[in-house]
Amino acid sequence: MEEPGRPSAAVLIVEDEPLIRMGAVDLIENAGFEVYEAGSADAAIALLELHKEIRLIFTDVDMPGSMDGLKLAHYVRGRWPPVKIIVTSGHVKLTEESLPGGALFLPKPYEPAQITHKVRELLAG
């Protein structure tokens, strides 16, 4: 049962750097969202399969494992089309053409207020 005033959508943070991931999780939780976290694309896919309430993924590009964050974003778009996607990186600048349809790119370092605004905006639309 959802709490009054608490959004019903959950956000999945996918980031291999633990300190950055913890900061992003705190940011999104403080904005009032339920948050799941994964350190790799493989872990993210497992969480998406288990938790149908996940409505947005916020993923870093550079990650170890079978796929990076950009490949994960394309995979999610194909398998779970309604899930909103935000991709971030401090190393590469992605073009709109390289992102899956409807995904946003936010370069690191990002402003906390910018992230919470974009998450709210995407989940409202």
Regions found by a protein language model. Name each.
Residues 1-12, 18-19, 25, 43, ...:
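Non-catalytic signal-transmission and effector/linker regions of two-component phosphorelay proteins
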Residues 18-36:
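Two-component/phosphorelay signaling modules centered on CheY-like receiver
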Residues 37-56:
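Acidic, metal-coordinating helix/loop segments flanking the phosphotransfer/catalytic sites
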Residues 40, 67-72:
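Acidic catalytic/metal-coordinating carboxylates
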Residues 60-61:
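Active-site residues of response regulator receiver
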Residues 88-89:
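Hydrophobic/aromatic residues positioned on beta-strands within the core alpha/beta folds
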Residues 94-102:
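Short loop/helix-cap segments at secondary-structure boundaries that form the rim of catalytic
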